[in-house]
Amino acid sequence: MIIPWQGLAPDTLDNLIESFVLREGTDYGEHERSFEQKVADVKRQLQSGEAVLVWSELHETVNIMPKKQFRE
């Protein structure tokens, strides 16, 4: 289920994004990006609609994923 990120308190959203960035081992290519840059990238992707905030009933967890990968 997609969670509308706009309805979350700013601190809650920031904490979810930071948690996501910390557990993702994404390779950013030749130039490593700072934690702050990664957080800003994820926030931008949520704002643009490229990424969505998702609740998994099966795992009882919240995750962030590319919108094109989300299946209801």
UniProtKB/Swiss-Prot annotation:
SUPFAM superfamilies: YehU-like. This is UPF0270 protein YheU. Pfam families: UPF0270 (PF06794). InterPro entries: UPF0270 (IPR010648), YehU-like_sf (IPR036685). Belongs to the UPF0270 family.
